[in-house]
From Swiss-Prot:
This protein's GO CC annotations: extracellular region
Record PTM Phosphoserine, positions in chain: S284
Listed name of the protein: Selenoprotein P
Keyword vocabulary terms for this entry: Glycoprotein, Phosphoprotein, Repeat, Secreted, Selenium, Selenocysteine, Signal
Domain notes: The C-terminus is not required for endocytic uptake in the proximal tubule epithelium.
Major subcellular location class: secreted
Function: Constitutes a major selenium pool in the brain and may play an important role in developing and/or modulating the morphology of neurons and/or glial cells.
Name of the encoding gene: SELENOP
Biased composition, class Basic residues, residue ranges: 203-231, 259-269
Amino acid sequence: MWRGLGLALALCLLLTGGTESQGQSSYCKQPPPWSIKDQDPMLNSYGSVTVVALLQASUYLCILQASRLEDLRVKLEKEGYSNISYVVVNHQGISSRLKYVHLKNKVSEHIPVYQQEENQPDVWTLLNGNKDDFLIYDRCGRLVYHLGLPYSFLTFTYVEDSIKTVYCEDKCGNCSLKALEDEDVCKNVFLATKEKTAEASQRHHHPHPHSHPHPHPHPHPHPHPHPHHGHQLHENAHLSESPKPDTPDTPENPPPSGLHHHHHRHKGPQRQGHSDNCDTPVGSESLQPSLPQKKLURKRCINQLLUQFPKDSESALSSCCCHCRHLVFEKTGSAITUQCTEKLPSLCSUQGLLAEENVIESUQURLPPAAUQAAGQQLNPTEASTKUSUKNKAKMUKUPSN
């Protein structure tokens, strides 16, 4: 069960790709020493699984994240995952420092919220982190996962499942600080999962009497990989030695260490990640959406941007338009961004849900719709501009007129 969990995490990482070289990766390494005032949070939590959340008190989404983190702590504790330390580090900026108390009030006394001083080395920078990142360390203080948006949203289960993986698996090798009580928790979870799997298998293969001479086939359920991380996440994950889906004969050997991705959230507008396009262009097998992508695509997009290509753009002849999607999740008021990984001629900048939030989005190109192809229309390039015009609540990729 846990090996499958690690595989699900690893597959998502492979989809997003890393930007940091293997030599620079901090995977399975202790972080640089950092402290706030006279407190050393990593030292204080040594011996327990440690979850460090980088939240910004001036950000509405971060306030929601803090509240959900408290809910997650309670949930995991009820399930027996009690040996976990949670640490929240507020942003160093003046606006965040002024709202520190508001952030602190969103969690209980079990989750300390640390406020950086203005003149101290920035902890976020030391950890190569950004807003809404989650860093998960094992009991020996070694970094196992670094999750960034969108996978650090606590409305997903990626953070939760990553914590459980670190709790029960020795991703970075043996740690002598693992307690017997923790071993018992993991064994109980494994046995419970095994029993549920066996029961589901029995129900699936149990023949049902039919009056028809030809019984109806039962649809096969599609497995949902538990957590993954990905996209702009400084993630340091070890690939599971489990075989990949649809390749049952793959030998169970761990991959080379070069596949331990450390995903960087880029400082500038050039960002990589999953495309949220579920309507894959014809003849483009490489763009077939994965399970994690399909999961993201279930959410409705409410914003669409139409891009203008420069005249010398190679994509202009093969694309009817280029659009960016800004996903908004129900009941959360929070937004995430999906992009494609291919090289594109332009970037789009849109206003976020809040006035101070700017969302940088990569354009995703499509082949012309059937109507465009039938009419033999091509993209009518405008002046060498890379700006995008926002079309709120646009549903379709529109064909430009000549």
